[in-house]
Amino acid sequence: MARHGCLGLGLFCCVLFAATVGPQPTPSIPGAPATTLTPVPQSEASMLSLNLGLNFKFHLRGPAAVWGSPVTETQPLSLGPGQEPGEEVASGLRTDPLWELLVGSSGNSLTEWGSTEGGSKPRASSLLPESTSRRSGPSDGPTAPYQPRRSTVTWDTALMVTALPSSAPRPHQSELELKFDMALRAGAAPTLGHRTLPLLPSLRASLAEIAGRLGPFGFFGTTLSPLRNFSGLSPPGETTSTSSASGVSGSLGFLGTTLSLPPYSLERKLSSPSPLDPAASLSFASIATTSLDPTVPISGPDDLSPPASLGNPSGQPECGPGSCSVGELPEREGQPPEAPRPLFFLTLEADWAEARARWGLAWEAHVYGVGALFGLVALLALLALALLPWRCPPGAPCLALLDLLLLSAGTTRAFPLFYDAYGHRDRLPALAWLLLQDLPLPCLAAGLGLACLLLARPRPPRCPTGLAALLLLGLGLAAAAALGSAAHRPLRPLRLASRGLHAFLAAFLSGLLLALSCWGGRRRRAGAPLGGSGFKGATPLPQGRSPFAPRESWRRAARTAPVAGTFGLLSGALQGYEVLHALGYGGQSGLEGPWPWWAFQLGLRLGEVGVALPLALLGLYPALCSPRVPPRCWAKLFRLSPGHAAPLLPGGWVTGPPDKEPLGSAIARGDAELLQLCALAGPGPDLLLQGGGCRGFEGAAANPAPSPASSPCSDYTVDFRPPSPINLRRSIEEALCSEALLAPGLFQGPAFEDALPGLGLYRTASLGTGGRASERSGEASGPAAPPELPSPGAWPAGSSVSSGSFCGLSRDSSSMLLCSSPDRPPRCPLVCVLSPPRPSGSSPSLPASGSYQALSPPSRDSPEPASELQAEEALLQEQFLDACRQIDELSVGSDTIDL
């Protein structure tokens, strides 16, 4: 009665749960049995199901059910860690009458429990758990030999191991024992290409999952291994097996990156089976739900021998010389396979051939399109560098550094994209590829900092020490990270630190650039110049200015700042996420695969191009559209210009009143030539008077009209050409013509000041500064001069005077001449002539004291005739010339002359 009661209970449970399991699709090949957890085909829609399979295991123990009963399977069932060895006989065909009563005649093929297809006979085969292997068909009929298959570990098989521990085998009894192993599983039906996590997995899988998620690298989700862990390790067709459910996640990868089998490789192996392979033609769903225990060897197609260590879970399988292929060699426990260097922080999860087949034209557009954009950045930076020496805009050193950084970033990005995009052809060594991958990041970050300086400072920006140190630190850190990660595996965190630092700098400087563009635009619209004091009107601008000092130039340059700042924030965010993903945070299940990887890499490249291209335009604008282009920029660049030490200001004048300096310093400075000399064409007189009424020159022309350019308040350098080369005579005269050598009464005095108010001497820069000339003209201001003056004499024939000039040279161009103001009333005040030295004996009446009284001009009521006046003037001229010659003779041998 006990046997019949157990049998009835079993049949009742089978009928009860037949509807719960539902109909299952038939296998693709006739005679191939199906399993319980066959996923829904790809064409059918996924639906939520609740599988309450009571995985029945019939343990038939009796006189006919012995341990050594032959079975018809060529590959034994894989046992769980705690499964009894006697449980494997449940799948074999028995000769016990009770077995025939339960399962029917031996000609019927075994189908899965609860299936309603294939006939009206009851299906009494048990539901095996997911950890067991497939069963072969009956041995009665002529069937093809069973071909063992390689199994693939998936999430369905790894997280649903429901083997329960059991004790030692019991003594054989002649009774029917029903054992219920309930595996409650709820969730969506598995579909091809997607992994499903059970809502209520088994106890062992739950503990492993909880331990993995509570770890530091799996809190936000399970991350994946680097790119080439699966695409470059094994030949096609090779799979990887794990030891347990908790062994699905390994320690491979970068900084705790877990190891999981790629679902795309499984899909590739299962979606296109060969028509000539009967084992590959089996249902791919049955293969997906099959688990392979590492303790059971995987035999080749020609090896039908049972394993030697069937009941030893810890024993290693033994393979003959030809029984195990390369891809079927067992893994050594506790020693994971060696993973290559992780070139990417977000994995591709497929090999390059499959990924490029999926991408199609998108791969070509990604590689060549982005490579062309980086090449354009490099060309713009090179053009700006070539134009900078010719245009020489303000702030040229800072612009040159910006162009150099952009040229480096553009070339290091464009070259690997065209030559070996993302290393898929393995043309570049790993170290070179890592350097080309990491070095553009500090260059772009430093470029953003230079853009902030160019747009923020009104004066010519000087590259500060902090920015230069930061640039060197970033480049050194990137190079050290690439070298360390390529040489030694434990130094890989240095590469993460470098990438994180550059991501933070890019985001920070991009935000600062956006803020500067907005704040500077508001300040410009308010009307105050950027960096100025707020006053209006004509103000003296400094000699060196910012390349964007004009309002219109700054406004045009500021248009590139929002674009560069926005793309810089995008690039920094993507790089930061890449670092977090490598650390184990943010790795969601939908981010692995070719298309997410393609989109992520495209976003990174577009963010870098969006930063580099506006910065290249920013550096090119001053070189093309600089409002002020100084001449001879090459000479100034290489210090070849004669005026590079002190450039001349417009008109030869300084902006403010000059300080009182020694007269000899005018030659040393070279920029105080306020009144240059001019050479007269042809022979000229010894004495040149312009606008004066001096007697003694007969046949003088009428008084010429005063030139407006010769007035004391006008520019004195309009009618003059550049000065002639300095000779020794002129240098000595200028060095000795100081106020300390001449008496205070010379050219001054009561008679001169009373008789000639408003008249003054205009001296060249070699004899004094413009300030002294104005002081003398101010001291001599007074009432107007008498209207009646004698007419001056005529100019000698052959002489020529520059229009409006009041100085000249003698016939031999070796002496300097001073004349009075031409716009004053026509009088001849005092004239001094410096002529070549003559013998000192020609002036016997020269006083011995060396001090002379000021010469008074002739008055209107003077009774002296014209001949006497002419003789007196000639005598005075001779006395003055003799005094000058004596000074020259005494000072020629002096050591104090500064040439």
Swiss-Prot record:
GO-annotated cellular components: membrane
Keyword Ribonucleoprotein in annotation: no
Residues covered by region (Disordered): 110-152, 295-340, 769-797, 839-869
InterPro entries: PRRT_domain-containing
Modification Phosphoserine, positions: 641
Membrane topology of this protein: Multi-pass membrane protein
Ranges of Low complexity composition bias in the record: 840-851
N-terminal signal peptide: 1-23
Organism from which the protein derives: Homo sapiens
Gene: PRRT4
Coiled-coil spans in chain: none
The protein, known as: Proline-rich transmembrane protein 4
Compartment annotation: Membrane
Transmembrane domains' residue ranges: 370-390, 392-412, 430-450, 467-487, 500-520
Record keywords, A-Z: Membrane, Phosphoprotein, Signal, Transmembrane, Transmembrane helix
Chief site of localization: membrane
